[in-house]
């Protein structure tokens, strides 16, 4: 066997030089409809030097796997001709050898598009090839993507269908550049997607070996990036074997592979030639890795000696079909003298020389090439040695060639008349046919819905492969058929190919600055993030409105619902204490109604209304502490605001009533506003605001902004309405503060201006502090309750001095003491009034006439002090000395 293989690849096994256009044809058979075929039957062109003449080079190094592919096309066409699919129509073929060279392939493409039945083999130039009749109607091939691209640009000029059986480059899916290109296999997009899927699920860090052309390089990069596959290194080998640096680059690649000791998985996206040389040298260096090999390389692996020493090889192969008839075809293969099949004759020649010694090998090949073998057996068929051919058959490619021939045949069946290639292309794109139990068709981008098989190259009973899974293109999943292959698939995923130990649950991978993009460190998940998987590179998401997670958590927790806090006990205690104070003040005032201190506080209704408002303010804080309900949510703010407003209004009325007696300007100013329209407008606005706050506000809501709890709280509704109520109360408080401040010089036992001023200052400070705080947070309501308590206690201060006098200084709570205070204040007040009267008299004397306004002001001033006396029950006219009364 080794001698036979040596004979197949020696330089003497070269094709004949091209003398005439017919010499370019490797195999041919006539028919009504001709199909072209492009196959790399020879590995390379013979000359490695720069060409000096525009002539087609000789080919060298006979390739058995590709030779078998040409036989697969011939067999498939014969199967169609022997069937009833194309009744009365015979398919013919012309197969060309591309020699793995673009120039030779272009020469074959030119012959395919040359004019039919033309003795000169010319390609006519036309602006419109709609009615042009070329030599062939369609082309099957080529194998290499680079060659298919070059050929497709020529065939696309006439929109001649080109169906490749092996070209998988994703670039060929571009229908703008390659409008007539189709393929009976899936594109690299799906193959690389399947590879990236397998690698990502296994968590491997990989190395990538590719060629420096379009084959898989760009698509693989896109898919690995999309699946977050970590690439430790990447090496690119020269695409063409004629490159003199290829051996050096292979050695450098293997050295890099050895240096990356922790990278145990290598993805190989190379051609058969590259894989054969790479693996052969890797076996010599005892490199043991996991090799993931693309579909182009799988047929080569079985031919590599001692390939099992290289480690595990996982191959992606084209999905296989029923090719049993082709096996029978090979077993009965023979050479007919009349056959126009140069590859078959070359195979027969090399088979005949397999027994020759090295010294006689050259002479044997020379004799065979002169046709002595054919003349010797011209009377009978020459049966070939075919016992080894099946081992070199790539079943997936054979099936792809069968599908290509079938697709063309079904498209021709739909036409069944004289047609042009572009008409065949239109039908071919939409053809659907059955092969076995499967239905096949072309996608819009030109690939067929075939898929891939994943095989593990391992020797079992003399065979070098075992199917592990099938890749489903549509659902992006691996389908495992039996338990044995499932175990193999599971064991494959257990292989370690990582730089670091995997991160535990509650951690994630974070990329570090290193020469490798895959280096990472394990970092603990921060608060409100979690990870329940090992070796993950991202945090898991959850609904942070309803759940939370601590630092380094492996799971998330549901937020607890809260509406009470231990601080509420303290606030309730302060509220109850305030209620007790109000009740105590009410009791004290009730028991001392007829004392001067109580009477000096104002009218009876005013006193009790103010105390009742304080009571409501303290009691209203309870609506903020209990569980939120619709009624409490809608009424609590309104209750507090109205209580404060009513309380401050009565205090303002009390202060303003006295102040008016001494200010004529204030009386004139208030006359402008003391009219029905302003009063009705203001009161109506207050009612509307309160109504909106009660009925238009949402009742109960949830505050989900806190990290670990959900606050069950009331929603305040319209901020504008709420602010309007607070603003109105603030305006009243400010007016009350001004009036109290202006009346601070009145008799102390009668006047409460100092304490009202103090209470209003506390009120302002508290609510001004509340504005920036009342925005957000768990303790927002706590702050509001504290502000309410502080401001309410501050206003209550106006009652504390009177209670102190009633309880502790009863000797000052007498009529005589109050009369004495009035008497001591009266000379000062009367003197001021007399001085004012004198000034008015002097002014009147110097003026031409008197002013009625000045006279009225003087009368008001005289009445002011009398009003003070009337407010006090103890102030009587008979108690005053006659001189002081007459002086006023």
Curated annotation (Swiss-Prot):
Cellular localisation:
Cell membrane
**Keywords of this entry:** Cell membrane, Disulfide bond, G-protein coupled receptor, Glycoprotein, Membrane, Receptor, Signal, Transducer, Transmembrane, Transmembrane helix
Give the superkingdom in one word.
Eukaryota
Coiled coil regions, renumbered to chain: none
TM annotation in the entry: 569-589, 605-625, 642-662, 677-697, 719-739, 755-775, 780-800
Q: What does this protein do?
A: Receptor activated by multiple ligands, including osteocalcin (BGLAP), basic amino acids, and various cations. Activated by amino acids with a preference for basic amino acids such as L-Lys, L-Arg and L-ornithine but also by small and polar amino acids. The L-alpha amino acids respond is augmented by divalent cations Ca(2+) and Mg(2+). Seems to act through a G(q)/G(11) and G(i)-coupled pathway.
The protein's name in its UniProt record: G-protein coupled receptor family C group 6 member A
Gene name, Swiss-Prot/TrEMBL: GPRC6A
């Amino acid at each position: 066997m080794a001698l036979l293989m040596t004979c197949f690849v020696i330089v003497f096994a070269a094709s004949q030089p091209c003398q005439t256009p017919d010499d370019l044809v490797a195999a041919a058979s006539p028919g009504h409809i001709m199909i072209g075929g492009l196959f790399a039957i020879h590995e390379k062109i013979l000359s490695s030097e720069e060409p000096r003449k525009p002539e087609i080079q000789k080919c060298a190094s006979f390739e058995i796997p590709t030779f078998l592919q040409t036989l697969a096309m011939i067999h498939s066409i014969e199967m169609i001709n022997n069937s009833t699919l194309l009744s009365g129509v015979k398919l013919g073929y012309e197969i060309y050898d591309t020699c793995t060279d673009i120039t030779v392939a272009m020469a074959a493409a030119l012959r395919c598009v040359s004019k039919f039945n033309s003795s000169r083999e010319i390609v006519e130039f036309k602006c419109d090839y709609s009615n042009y009749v070329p030599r062939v109607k369609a082309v099957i091939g080529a194998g290499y993507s680079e060659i298919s691209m070059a050929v497709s640009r020529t065939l696309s000029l006439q929109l001649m269908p080109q169906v490749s059986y092996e070209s998988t480059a994703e670039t060929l899916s571009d229908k703008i550049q390659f409008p007539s290109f189709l393929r009976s296999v899936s594109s690299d997009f799906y193959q690389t997607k399947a590879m990236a899927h397998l690698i990502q699920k296994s968590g491997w860090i990989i190395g990538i070996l590719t060629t420096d052309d379009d084959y898989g390089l760009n698509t693989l990069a896109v898919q690995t990036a999309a699946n977050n596959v970590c690439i430790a290194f990447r090496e690119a080998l020269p695409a063409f074997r004629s490159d003199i640096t290829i051996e050096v680059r292979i050695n450098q690649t293997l050295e890099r592979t050895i240096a990356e000791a922790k990278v145990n998985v290598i993805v190989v996206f190379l051609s058969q030639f590259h894989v054969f040389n790479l693996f052969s040298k890797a076996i010599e260096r005892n490199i043991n890795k996991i090799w993931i090999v693309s579909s182009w390389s799988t047929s080569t692996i079985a031919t590599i000696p001692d390939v099992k020493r290289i480690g595990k090889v996982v191959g992606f192969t084209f999905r296989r079909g029923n090719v049993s008839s082709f096996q029978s075809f090979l077993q009965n293969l023979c050479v007919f003298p009349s056959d126009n099949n140069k590859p078959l004759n070359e195979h027969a020649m090399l088979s005949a020389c397999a027994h020759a010694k090295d010294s006689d090998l050259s002479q044997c090949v020379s004799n065979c090439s002169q046709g002595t073998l054919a003349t010797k057996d011209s009377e009978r068929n020459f049966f070939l040695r075919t016992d080894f051919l099946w081992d070199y058959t790539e079943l997936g490619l054979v099936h792809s060639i069968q599908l290509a021939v079938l697709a063309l045949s079904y498209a021709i069946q739909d036409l069944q008349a004289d047609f042009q290639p572009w008409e065949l292309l239109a039908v071919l794109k939409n053809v659907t046919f059955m092969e076995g139990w499967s239905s096949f068709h072309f996608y819009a981008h030109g690939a067929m819905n075939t898929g891939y098989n994943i095989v593990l190259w391992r020797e079992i009973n003399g065979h070098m492969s075992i199917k592990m899974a099938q890749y489903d293109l549509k659902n992006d999943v691996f389908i495992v058929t039996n338990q044995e292959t499932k175990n193999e698939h599971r064991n494959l995923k257990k292989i370690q190919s990582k730089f670091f130990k995997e991160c535990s649950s509650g951690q994630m991978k974070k990329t570090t600055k290193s020469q490798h993009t895959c280096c990472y460190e394990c970092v603990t998940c921060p608060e409100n993030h979690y990870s329940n998987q090992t070796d993950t590179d991202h945090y898991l998401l959850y609904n942070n409105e309803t759940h939370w997670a601590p630092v380094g958590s492996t799971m998330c927790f549901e937020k607890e619902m809260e509406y009470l806090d231990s601080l509420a006990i303290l606030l309730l205690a302060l509220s109850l204490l305030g209620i007790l104070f109000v009740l105590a003040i009410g009791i004290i005032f009730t028991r001392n109604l007829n004392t001067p201190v109580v009477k000096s506080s104002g009218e009876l209704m005013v006193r009790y209304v103010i105390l009742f408002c304080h009571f409501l303010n303290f009691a209203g804080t309870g609506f903020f502490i209990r569980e939120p309900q619709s009624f409490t949510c809608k009424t609590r703010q309104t209750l507090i605001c109205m209580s404060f407003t009513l309380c401050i209004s009565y205090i303002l009325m009390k202060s303003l009533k006295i102040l008016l007696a001494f200010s004529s300007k204030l009386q004139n100013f208030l006359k402008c506003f003391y009219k029905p329209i302003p009063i009705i407008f203001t009161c109506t606005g207050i009612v509307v605001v309160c109504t909106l706050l009660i009925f238009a506000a949402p009742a109960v809501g949830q505050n989900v902004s806190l990290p670990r709890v959900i606050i069950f709280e009331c929603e305040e509704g319209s901020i504008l309405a709420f602010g309007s109520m607070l603003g109105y109360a603030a305006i009243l408080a400010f007016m009350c503060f001004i009036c109290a401040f202006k009346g601070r010089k009145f008799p102390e036992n009668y006047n409460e201006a100092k304490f009202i001023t103090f209470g209003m200052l506390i009120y302002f400070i508290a609510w001004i502090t509340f504005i920036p705080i009342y925005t957000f947070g768990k303790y927002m309501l706590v702050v509001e309750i504290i502000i309410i308590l502080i401001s309410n206690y501050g206003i209550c201060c106006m009652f504390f001095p009177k209670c102190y006098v009633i309880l502790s200084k009863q000797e000052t709570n007498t009529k005589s003491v109050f009369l004495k205070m009035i008497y001591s204040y009266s000379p000062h007040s009367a003197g001021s009034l007399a001085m004012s009267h004198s000034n008015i008299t002097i002014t009147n004397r110097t003026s031409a006439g008197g002013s009625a306004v000045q006279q009225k002001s003087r009368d008001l001033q005289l009445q002011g002090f009398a009003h003070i006396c009337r407010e006090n029950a103890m102030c009587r006219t008979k108690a005053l000395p006659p001189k002081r009364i007459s002086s006023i």
